[in-house]
Amino acid sequence: MKKIAYLIIAALVLLAALLFSLSSCSTSGQKFPESKEMILWYNKPAGDVWLDGLLIGNGYMGGNVFGRVHHERIALNESSFWSGRPHDYNDPDAFNYFDKIKKLVFADKFKEAEEMVNNHFYGMPVTQQAYQPLGDLLLNFSVTNDSIKNYYRELDMETGVVKISYTDGDVKMTREVFMSYPHHVMVMKVSADKPGRVSVEAKLRSHFTEEIIAQNNNLILNGTWKYIPERESWLIAKVEGTGMNFQISMSAIPENGKLEATDSSLIVTDANSVTFILTAATSFINYKDISGDPAVKCEKIMAEVKGKDFKELKSTHLKDFSNLMSRVHLKIGDPLMNDRPTDERVADLKNGLPDPELLAKIFQFGRYLLVSSSREGSEPANLQARWDEELLPNWGSKYTVNINTEMNYWPAEVTNLSECHMPLFHMLKDLSETGAKTAKTYYNAGGWVLHHNTDLWRGTAPVDAARYGMWPMGGSWLCQHIWEHYLYTGDVEFLREYYPIMKGSAQFLMDIMDFEPKYNWLVVPFSVSPEQGYFVDDNEEEMFLSSSTTMNVGIIRDLFPHCIEAGKIINADQEFGEKLAEALKKIPPYQIGKDGLLQVWIEDWKRGNEGHNMSANFGFFPGNSITLRRNPEIAQAIQKWLEPRQARTSWTNAWDICDWARLENGVKIDTVIRDFFHSRPPRLRRFLGAGRNTTPGTAAGPSIPPGMMRFGIGNNLHNSSSNQSDANFGFTAGIAECLLQSHAGEISILPALPVSWENGSIKGLKARGGFEVDINWENGKLATCVIKSILGNPCIVRYGEKIKTYNIKAGSSIKITGEI
């Protein structure tokens, strides 16, 4: 019956698509691209809704293009533009309380320990800084006809180009806009199919404007970040005075027509076309230094593109951007669905109508966001990747490292975007410096530590409150990304460069771990399990701090073996590796409680607020100290916990997909994917107090933005849960995990193929050990698989219960079928 219902729904969707294509609508007469595999398109502008805009970026900058006809807005961000200024968050008196807190925890006096942490073991201040909106480019167009026809707006994810077109009377107007990584500029061309019909006024604005200069064909906005007292959030530290300087610099290059500079704008009239070239820079040099000159930076960039026309700039951009995006292609579902506007398909998907082809787009959108927000030399992707319009973004749009930052980079290696991983590693170098001081100041330990959040200023001290921030494992988790990058690329020089960071994190843990008194296990002496509380006996008060958590055990079982193996590869630190190996014998085991679930803490306490975080599952995913076949009982305990679970945010749902993929359950994957997109009523934001404001220069009080804190995606495919990008990245990683796994020492093909994806193909996924994999399946079964070896390592292939070992020379490929 379910299959019949599915077929009926699919038939209705196809019928709707056919009727839509035959009907007269605002896009009639438009010529669509031949291939729309990576194209999102719409027949109306975005209006004022942030998640309706189309996102572009080059790592350094981000832009949200709304596509309005009369008054266009492109919201701008710059990766280093944050609130505040360089700051040391460490409390010099913290270590005086370390032993006292440890003794309280070891004596099961958890409430007293938590109070002491909150009062004496936190950062100064107890909150960090926030990512900030840079400003807006505003374009006021001269429109001659009240009735605009044939409106069309698209984002081509393969090229990173947004196109907008419409008919104004008898003239077709077209805009193209992209952000170029090679040239560090945003480029926009406005053109008409008849001469002399382009007239537009260009303005810049920002919350932090100090000066606007319009001269010749140049428009410059100079600004300085300053504290705005009308806006408050207890999750973002107040900083009196000013912070970094910045500049937005733009030039206008018209073809024919007239160009006039007013006091604060550029006006182009009666041109055939006009090309706008824009860049931005801040005074940020590094986390310790904001003495740079943004004007000099902008002048250098603009000088390098001077004389280059739109065609040349676009060509260079396409070579760079498409090289990354075209590496992977996922084809599932009916391509005829592409004849429907993306927003209509999103609405149907939220209502439960199947659309696998749209799921393929959402998979690619996660890759697109990573390419657009994380490039060599830029800051890493933060909670909102690169796109923020609020002065008080949710959770400061920081780097939350108890899951969110890591999830941002889960798809980097497996979906063939290793280069986009690099900004995270560069930040780790900074954090190992600031974290060394925190390790010494708070724990009198060597190595380095990072707790659950950091910001541009590389704060590493505990922040927010004990139940959130008393978790010294953030740096250790991030070190997993170093090892993963090595496993996928085989880059020994990279490993040699970053091994000291892994070692430093392990050294910190070795220095602080102690034997708890009840079981004599070696543990991190006090920590929370992120966002999960417990009840002791019949005590009605929820506790968070404990002497050992399963997540901490999982991270240690991840980091220590990686350090040992890395030391062998680079021929270093054999003695240190031996100490780690001895410590591994003394840490707590994974435990299954009386309810059959994987325990979260050292004791089998009653679970309190489940929160969002699936922390106890770390060893299963993204770690691999627990695997389905090596640890079947523990895997079963994880499955038992997942089965009744209803994820509370989109990013937790994305983690669910990854866990079910590791459980190789394609039936459940279908359900979890469907849940990912269902809209649900927003939950009250208990503590954010964030004001929403889209207009620079005006105040905003506390409010709950439309669509915040709910499941699903916006019309532009971005996660609509708190505007965070992590769920998009996590969804992409989860889909890749369904189709290919390589964490258990073998390449597993189609381990968790969603049952509704009967036919399809994936091209270009990467596997650990240095392999590139293409897979085709028919009727839910493997048809062909091509495995190319990059490094020449031995290759163990699994399909279901069939296993075979191949020796493939570097640069060579093998082709196998379901019989392998």
Task: Enumerate the predicted regions with their spans.
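C-terminal catalytic domain of Rieske-type non-heme iron oxygenases
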Residues: 385, 389-390, 522-524, 532, ...
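Aromatic-residue-lined binding/catalytic grooves and analogous aromatic/hydrophobic interfacial grooves
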Residues: 28-467, 473, 478, 482-486, ...
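Acidic/histidine-rich catalytic neighborhood
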Residues: 504, 508-566
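Secondary-structure transition/capping motifs at alpha-helix termini
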Residues: 193-196, 372-377, 485-496, 508-521, ...
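Bacterial N-terminal signal peptides that target proteins for export
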Residues: 1-12
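Catalytic cores of secreted or luminal carbohydrate-active enzymes
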Residues: 122-144, 725-768, 772-773
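Bacterial Sec-dependent signal peptides at the C-terminal "C-region" and cleavage site
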Residues: 16-33
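Extended, hydrophobic alpha-helical segments in both membrane/secreted and soluble proteins
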Residues: 404, 471-485, 494-511, 652, ...
